[in-house]
Swiss-Prot record:
Pathway(s) where this gene product acts: Amino-acid biosynthesis; L-leucine biosynthesis; L-leucine from 3-methyl-2-oxobutanoate: step 1/4
Catalytic activity: 3-methyl-2-oxobutanoate + acetyl-CoA + H2O = (2S)-2-isopropylmalate + CoA + H(+)
Molecular-function annotations in GO: 2-isopropylmalate synthase activity; acetyl-CoA C-acetyltransferase activity; magnesium ion binding
Subunit structure: Homodimer.
Coiled coil: none
HAMAP family: LeuA_type2
Disulfide bridge map: none
Protein name per UniProt: 2-isopropylmalate synthase
Enzyme class name: transferase
Superkingdom in the source lineage: Bacteria
């Protein structure tokens, strides 16, 4: 019988399940995402305010410039009324002409008149700007934090919108495009009908219409429920909002339950037009939804994210430098280890996948880097985001033949026969168990050369050969035998069999079971590798030889097998 789980003893009774949305005819489960939503980066606002040490102007500029290079067209640049630093940064961007003509900056404000005025003042001189107003609408915040009823809460949003329009008319007459965004904060905990009522009241004031879009942003300020519940909420709002064609329905998922990415994707399926988030998921508590993950999830499905992630390491380094927080090595798409396999079975599958990709691309007459990607364990080609294949397969005690042989082939052009892969992986495994940790390509090569290419009791120095009239191959070889140079002779149907015959004359009896060879590089002076599987005194083992002459490499491989038999 399977052991039965026992009660935890934790006070789970203190918590209540989230109420589902009554939406029996929901349509989002049958939808698919076919294009990228509009993106807004809030790295400089929501991301920045959650840092242990908020960014100074120089680091903010680095993030802003990065976002522009990547292709973000909507960037929330601060909370000007909350701090002088934020205000000064907005002024810096405008006065130093740092904002491209096709980028819309956004600033956040609470719904108090003096804060709204200072916020709008910060935008004077901007060509394109959005004011983002919010107030909390959930029952808990109405009752506990602000002590207001529904009508008073709605009144805050309505009056705040009027105030934004008043100051925009006063200060932003020269702005080419003025945008307005409203967020019922804590939307996810707000009664849906009340959230709709507030948004409708805000629209009544703003009067959206042709060329006068309103952004209604519906935040999962604290992630409370499974992503499907958030999707139901978004679909319900999308269905019931009037003037929907003039509304950009935006979502702002947080990651408190660890499902912000799924929540955002389902929300887009449910009708959201726009997603707000941060690079690598920075933000309050567990962070905002990760824009990197969302974008590259689309990319992995053959959809253009409309954002350039082709140098993921530059993006990560910039974010780490500016936030002074590291990106987790396991973070999707951007972490150090996300394209790395240590497990032997994973490594073997990836190695075979690369061989199949090269073969399929060649058969189709298409360059490998343009052929359809279909690779075990790797959802995207690391090269498409600026990574190399160097770290795809790394070797430790969990690695098998696939990983070890892949590293040798990648770094040293050594293409081991399958049975030799198995034999050598056992050798590496012994070292890995003894030494622990990860093995570099250099360490694997060191073990390989010590095992197969080092000097032993016998080594070939030179040889001479001829073929008799009846086709028999005759060899005369100078060999180093236990420190002395000896000449040995033998005959056979080829150089290997003749050399084996010669070795038998000095006491080394072996039977060759398999042989393979390949060039290590191209050109007239290319070296070759030869592999010999032999039975020596009842033991089956492999020998390896490397030389600029393929016959010499073959004879060295025979000597390697003999030497390994002597050591075993």
């Amino acid at each position: 019988m399977i052991p039965q789980q026992q009660p935890s003893g934790m006070p789970f009774h203190r918590y209540q399940p989230f109420k589902p949305v009554d939406l029996p005819d929901r349509t989002w489960p049958s939808k698919t995402i076919t294009k990228a939503p509009r993106w807004l980066s809030t790295d400089l606002r929501d991301g920045n305010q959650a840092l242990i040490e908020p960014m100074d102007t120089e680091r903010k500029r680095e993030i802003f410039d990065l976002l522009v290079r990547m292709g973000y067209k909507e960037i929330e640049v601060g909370f000007p009324a909350a701090s002088q630093t934020d205000y000064d940064f907005v002024r810096y961007l405008i006065e130093e002409d740092r904002i491209p003509d096709d980028v819309q900056i956004s600033v956040l404000t609470q719904a108090r008149e003096e804060l709204i005025e200072r916020t709008v003042q910060s935008l004077v001189g901007a060509k394109r700007a959005t004011v983002h107003l919010y107030n909390a609408t959930s029952p808990e915040f109405r009752r506990i934090v602000f002590g207001v009823n529904r009508e008073e809460c709605k009144g805050i949003a309505v009056e705040g919108t009027r105030t934004v329009l008043k100051f925009a008319e006063q200060y932003l007459k020269d702005t080419e495009y003025f945008g307005y965004e409203y967020s019922p904060e804590i939307f996810i905990d707000t009664e849906l009908e009340f959230a709709l009522e507030v948004c409708e009241a805000v629209m009544d004031v703003y009067q959206p219409g042709p060329d006068r879009e309103i952004i209604l942003n519906l935040p999962a300020t604290v992630e409370r429920a499974t992503p499907n519940v958030y999707a139901d909420q978004i679909e319900w709002m999308s269905r019931n909002l009037s003037r929907r064609e003039y509304v950009c329905l935006s979502v702002h998922p947080h990651n408190d339950r660890g499902t912000a990415v799924a929540a955002a994707e389902l929300a887009v399926m449910a009708g959201a037009d726009r997603v707000e988030g941060c690079l690598f998921g920075h933000g309050e508590r567990t962070g905002n939804v990760c824009l990197v993950t969302l974008g590259l999830n689309l990319f992995s499905q053959g959809i253009d994210p409309m954002i350039d992630f082709s140098n993921i390491d530059e993006i990560r380094r910039t974010v780490e430098h500016c936030t002074q927080l590291p990106v987790n090595p396991r973070h999707p798409y951007g972490g150090d280890l996300v394209y790395t396999a240590f497990s032997g079975s994973h490594q073997d599958a990836i190695k075979k996948g690369f061989h199949a990709l090269e073969a399929d691309a060649a058969a189709a007459g298409v360059p490998v880097d343009e052929y359809r990607w279909n690779m075990p364990y790797l959802p995207i080609d690391p090269k498409d985001v600026g990574r190399t294949y160097e770290a795809v397969i790394r070797v430790n005690s969990q690695s098998g033949k696939g990983g070890v042989s892949y590293v040798l082939q990648r770094d040293y052009s050594i293409d081991l026969p399958r049975r030799l892969q198995i034999e050598f992986s056992r050798v590496v495994q012994q070292f890995a168990d003894a030494e622990g940790g990860e093995f570099s390509g250099e360490r694997i090569w060191e073990i390989f050369t010590d095992t197969y290419l080092s000097e032993g009791v016998v080594g070939v120095m030179a040889y001479r050969s001829e073929t008799s009239e009846d086709g028999e191959y005759c060899i005369s070889a100078d060999v180093r035998l236990r420190g002395e140079i000896r000449e040995i002779t033998g005959t056979g149907n080829g150089p290997i069999s003749a050399f084996v015959d010669a070795l038998a004359g000095v006491g080394f009896k072996l039977r060759v079971l398999d042989y393979s060879e390949h060039a290590l590089s191209e050109g007239g002076d290319a070296r070759a590798a030869a592999y010999v599987e032999a039975e020596v005194d009842g033991n089956v083992l492999w020998g390896v030889g490397i030389s600029s002459n393929i016959t010499t490499a073959s004879l060295k491989a025979v000597c390697s097998a003999v030497n390994r038999a002597q050591q075993s």
